């Protein structure tokens, strides 16, 4: 689930 990882990082704070 690469999309989930990218979305999670962006929502978290652009990790």
UniProtKB/Swiss-Prot annotation:
Enzyme type, top EC level: hydrolase
Tagged with keyword Hydrolase: yes
Domain of life, per lineage: Eukaryota
Protein location: Cytoplasm
Catalyzed reactions per annotation: a carboxylic ester + H2O = an alcohol + a carboxylate + H(+)
Keyword tags: Cytoplasm, Hydrolase, Serine esterase
Gene Ontology CC annotations of this record: cytoplasm
EC number annotated for this UniProt entry: 3.1.1.1
Keyword Cytoplasm attributed: yes
GO molecular function: carboxylesterase activity
Family: Belongs to the type-B carboxylesterase/lipase family.
Name of the protein this chain belongs to: Esterase 56 kDa subunit
Native species: Schizaphis graminum
């Amino acid at each position: 689930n690469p999309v989930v990882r990218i979305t999670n990082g962006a929502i978290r704070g652009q990790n």
